[in-house]
């Protein structure tokens, strides 16, 4: 059984993430979506909220072939997590050259930690390349329309959170 791990903060999960997930399921028999924390990011949602959001989106996803999809949280080195899950590959999405430079460096470091787990890069679909969770949050905080970047359910989650924390520039 080929297992892949797709790690991310998913704060929030975007249509770009969903595109990578759909396509990754055709490369593996089992895809483990790892929701994690990133010390360099300021999340809008807790790990538990993001986990629930991703699980909900995965329950609604179609066209994933026959791959089993599992959503879990983790708070460890990615390679340790991948080993625990029995993964043979790490799936990473790329939007632009800047993503590649960072991801290339991370893949090299990860290979030093475990050279039996490959990193596979999937290019985001052309129409999805500009989408980034950080930008989705920023647009929402200024009252902009995020409906082109996330599902309706995620948009509702983000709007509710913005209502709690307050809009910028209002």
Where are the regions that the model predicts?
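Nucleotidyltransferase catalytic core that binds NTPs
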Residues: 1-170
């Amino acid at each position: 059984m080929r297992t892949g791990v797709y790690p991310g903060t998913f704060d929030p999960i975007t249509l770009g993430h969903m595109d990578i997930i759909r396509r990754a399921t055709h490369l593996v028999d089992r895809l483990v979506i790892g929701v994690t924390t990133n010390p360099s990011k300021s999340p809008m949602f807790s790990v538990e909220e993001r986990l629930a959001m991703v699980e909900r989106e995965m329950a609604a996803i179609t066209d994933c072939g026959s791959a089993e999809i599992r959503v879990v949280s983790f708070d460890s080195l990615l390679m340790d997590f991948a080993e625990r899950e029995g993964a043979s590959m790490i799936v990473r999405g790329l939007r632009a050259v800047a993503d590649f430079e960072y991801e290339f460096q991370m893949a090299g470091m990860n290979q030093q930690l475990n050279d039996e787990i490959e990193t596979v890069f999937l290019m985001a679909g052309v129409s999805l390349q500009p989408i980034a969770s950080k930008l989705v949050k920023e647009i929402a905080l200024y009252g902009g329309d995020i409906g082109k970047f996330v599902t309706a359910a995620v948009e509702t989650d983000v709007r509710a959170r913005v209502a709690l924390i307050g809009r910028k520039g209002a």
